[in-house]
Structure formats: C-alpha cells, structure tokens
C-alpha cells in the first residue's frame, strides 16, 4: 500500500477541499490534514467501498437518478480502480483524507463527469457505515472458519486421548482424575459458544445503512432494498439517524472477540504450563518454540505466550471503542473515525491467535505416561472414596466427606497414598468399610465411573468429539 503524503499533496488537498469546501475560503493546514486523514488505515476497506459504490450506482440507474451510460462508466471505472489497488499500483493520498475520497477522485479522473454523479443521494456517513459493516461481516466469516478449524483439531486430539488420564485441577491443585481428551473438549465447547456469539453479532449487523445519507435520509427516489439485497444484507436499517451514528455492531463484534481471545489465552496458558519442566505433559516441536540467546538448553513456548498476551490488544480495542462512543450525541461526529483501527488490530490479533493455537494443537505431542503418573497424585481419588461411603454404606455425604478427610490426613501424615492404607486403618475411621473400597481408588476406576452426561468417562469423550465433528462436517 502506497500512501502519498508529500508529492502532489497541495493539489490533492485542493481536490479534497472541492469535495466539501464550497463554503470555505481557504484549505486545511498540514496539521489538519494529518489529524483528519484516515487513509493510513481505512485503505483496507477498498473492496467494501467499491462493492458499495457499484450497488449504489446500479440502484441510481435503475431508479432513473443517473443514466445507464453513467452507470456503465462508473462500473467500468470502479472495476479498473479495483484492479489497480489489487496490483499495488494505486497511490493513496493523505490529502484526500480517506478511502472514499481517494477512490472517488480517481474515478472522476478516469471517467470525468459521470464519476461526480456517483455520490448522488449518498453521504460519507452512510457510505462508511456500510463499508464498515461489510468489512466486519467478512471478518466474522473468516474468524468463524478459523475457529471451526481449531475445534476440529481439538476434537481429533480428544478422540486420540479419550482414555488417557491426566490430573484435573482446581486452584491449580490436583482435584480429580480426568482424561486429556475430556480436558481438550472443554475448549471445543467454549469455542462453540464463541462462534455462536459471532454469529449473533453477524445477524444483528446485517442491515444496510446505505441510503440514510448524512442523517435524515434523502429526497431522491432511491430503492434502499435494492442496494441492501445487492450487498447481501437482510434489510435496510430502519432509522437513518441510528444507521449513521452507532457502532454497536463493531462493539458487539469486539465483545465476542474479547471472550474468544480470553479462551485462547487460557488454552495457551495451559500449554505453557504443560510444556514446563515440572509438568512436562506435552512437547511442542521446533515449529512453535524458540530458544534463548544465552541459555542453549532452552525451548520456550513463545507461540503460546504471545497468544496469551494478545488478548490485551483485543480487550483494549473494545474498551477503546466504548470510550470513543460513550459521550457522542447523535448523529455522526469525527470521533467515530477512530472506530476502525481498533477493530482492524483486534481482528488481526484474533486471526493470528487462532492460527497459532490450531497449529500448536496439531503439533503437540502428549506425554501420556507423565500425565498418568500425576493423575493419581494429591489424593485425587478421595471423592471416589467419599462417594463409595454414600453409595454402599448409605452415609450422608457430609459425614462421608469428613471420614474421607480424616483418612486423607492419615495418609498424608505417613507420606503414602490412600490406596496404601490398610483396611484396618480405614475401618478405624468407619467400621463398615470393606475390602471393596480399594477398587474405587484407582485412577482408571475413577475416570470410568464418571458416566454422567458431560463427564470424563472415555465413552462420553468419544461421543462428544464425534458429535462435534459431525456438526462441523455439516458446516455448522
């Protein structure tokens, strides 16, 4: 992308002034041009801007507002401009402020008076609102596809490790045994909800502002439903003031993105922990690790650490845009020019984070022996003992909890596991305990017993993964 900040800037400033400067005696200062220009970032809207202009021109011709010849010239000119931008031959000018005026000025250069008719019954207010909605809609579709890919990777890993034990944690302390597959499927559920939130945001944003003009609509006999349909919107927006003055569609998108980034950050944090030497549950290949400039032995999980950090960009974008919008009276204010950069940056961060997580999940090697060894540590089957007391001896759960707690204390004082206590030790706390108690104290027994819906039993994990893979295969 080439942005022309100096060469011809005076000429371009005059041309920009010609777009809106009829009542001005002089042009903007260099500082005013710099602070006013958004072309440095909104050039990414060029595809959406051209698409919106093509739909608008077709509607103007259909309704008799411009001639068919003018519409044909506009279509030809915009198509050629699109090819120029695609090929990197378009010089964007800071003096022309934004993507809209850059394209319009170039169009007028190419086709003359017909290009100046394009902006009939349109304002930059409804133009940018339309472009931005189109861009966010495209971004949602792209991120949704990436999230679905990550979900598939997680499901396939979960199937592979549906029966491989690992410690489940609360407070990062050993709690109960689960399977690695069950743990991974938790993130599939989170990502499924993330995609649902993005889909909800997409549905609400899919109304077309074009035709709202500056804020009050237009006196020209336009057909807003025609342009809405041409651009893939469900309907035109219902209120012209609302259409040009709100960015809640972008805020909702950033909110959904922030929640998804938080989930990716949590997954990445766990990968960092699992890769650490004290855990050593998984290993990432050289493709997703880096070394140290001084310590030759180091293999750092930098990809995971960077994903963990990128949530700051995404949530920062949400807070930033909320702050921009919170005090604005209706309708449009120039403050709203600051809406796009945070959305673009957050989208880039989310896309890169999804790609990195997808790559890491497909790349990692699970150390199942290490996980299995730790799965039984920290008295992780204590709840199984308490459940046995309730189920077999009919003790109230709170009583069983206290009995089990005393047995844990005894085992801990001796430096042994629960299963290393003798039957006599256990009967000293609860006389009704029999030899059968030891059968529930194994990791495998604990995991196999968790057959409740959503539980960690291997068959549950396999069924959950298969269900999600079927859903994803059907494009949902």
Curated annotation (Swiss-Prot):
Classification lineage: Bacteria, Pseudomonadati, Pseudomonadota, Alphaproteobacteria, Acetobacterales
Enzyme class of the recorded protein, top EC level: lyase
GO biological-process terms attached to the record: arginine biosynthetic process via ornithine; L-arginine biosynthetic process
Record-linked InterPro entries: Arg_succ_lyase_C, Argininosuccinate_lyase, Fumarase/histidase_N, Fumarate_lyase_CS, Fumarate_lyase_fam, Fumarate_lyase_N, L-Aspartase-like
Domain of life per record: Bacteria
Name of this chain's protein: Argininosuccinate lyase
Family matches, as CDD domains: Argininosuccinate_lyase (cd01359)
EC number: 4.3.2.1
GO molecular function terms attached to this record: argininosuccinate lyase activity
Pathway where this protein functions: Amino-acid biosynthesis; L-arginine biosynthesis; L-arginine from L-ornithine and carbamoyl phosphate: step 3/3
UniProt KW keywords: Amino-acid biosynthesis, Arginine biosynthesis, Cytoplasm, Lyase
HAMAP family recorded: Arg_succ_lyase
Family statement: Belongs to the lyase 1 family. Argininosuccinate lyase subfamily.
GO cellular component term of the entry, any: cytosol
Pfam family, one: Lyase_1
Reaction equation(s) it catalyzes: 2-(N(omega)-L-arginino)succinate = fumarate + L-arginine
Subcellular location(s) per record: Cytoplasm
SUPFAM superfamilies noted in UniProt: L-aspartase-like (SSF48557)
């Amino acid at each position: 992308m080439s942005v022309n900040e100096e060469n011809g800037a005076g000429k371009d400033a005059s041309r920009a002034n010609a777009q809106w400067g009829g009542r001005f005696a002089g042009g903007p200062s260099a500082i005013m041009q710099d602070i006013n220009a958004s072309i440095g970032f909104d050039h990414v809207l060029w595809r959406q801007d051209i698409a919106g202009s093509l739909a608008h021109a077709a509607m103007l011709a259909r309704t008799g507002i411009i001639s068919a010849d003018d519409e044909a010239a506009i279509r030809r000119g915009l198509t050629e401009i699109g090819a120029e931008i695609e090929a990197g031959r378009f010089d964007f000018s800071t003096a022309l402020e934004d993507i809209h005026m850059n394209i319009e000025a170039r169009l007028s250069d190419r086709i003359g008076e017909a290009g100046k008719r394009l902006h009939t019954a349109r304002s930059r207010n409804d133009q940018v609102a339309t472009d931005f909605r189109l861009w966010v809609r495209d971004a949602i579709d792209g991120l949704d596809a990436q999230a679905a890919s990550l979900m598939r990777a997680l499901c396939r890993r979960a199937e592979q490790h549906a029966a491989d034990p690992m410690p489940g944690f609360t407070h990062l302390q050993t709690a109960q045994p689960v399977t690695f597959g069950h743990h991974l499927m938790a993130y599939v559920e989170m990502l499924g909800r993330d995609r649902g939130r993005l889909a909800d945001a997409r549905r609400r944003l899919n109304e077309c502002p074009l035709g709202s003009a500056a804020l009050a609509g237009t006196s020209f006999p336009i057909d807003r439903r025609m342009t809405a349909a041409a651009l893939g919107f469900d309907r035109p927006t219902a209120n012209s003031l609302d259409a040009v003055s709100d960015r809640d569609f972008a805020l909702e998108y950033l909110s959904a993105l922030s929640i998804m980034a938080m989930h990716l950050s949590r997954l990445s944090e766990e990968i960092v922990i699992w890769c650490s030497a004290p855990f050593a549950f998984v290993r990432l290949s050289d493709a997703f690790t880096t070394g140290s400039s001084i310590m030759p032995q180091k293999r750092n999980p930098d990809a995971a650490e960077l994903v963990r950090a990128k949530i700051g960009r995404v949530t920062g974008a949400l807070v930033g845009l909320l702050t921009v919008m919170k005090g604005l009276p209706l309708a449009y204010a120039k403050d709203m020019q600051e809406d796009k950069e945070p959305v673009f940056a957050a989208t880039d961060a989310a896309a890169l984070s999804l790609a990195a997580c997808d790559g890491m999940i497909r790349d990692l090697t699970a150390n199942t022996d290490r996980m299995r060894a730790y799965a039984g540590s920290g008295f992780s089957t204590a709840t199984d003992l308490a459940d046995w007391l309730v189920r077999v001896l009919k003790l109230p759960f709170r009583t069983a909890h206290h009995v089990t707690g005393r047995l844990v204390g005894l085992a801990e004082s001796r430096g042994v596991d629960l299963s290393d206590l003798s039957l006599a030790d256990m009967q000293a706390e609860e006389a009704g305990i029999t030899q059968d108690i030891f059968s529930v104290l194994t990791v495998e027994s604990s995991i196999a017993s968790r057959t409740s819906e959503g539980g960690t039993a291997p068959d549950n994990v396999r069924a959950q993964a298969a269900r999600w893979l079927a859903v994803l295969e059907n494009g949902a």
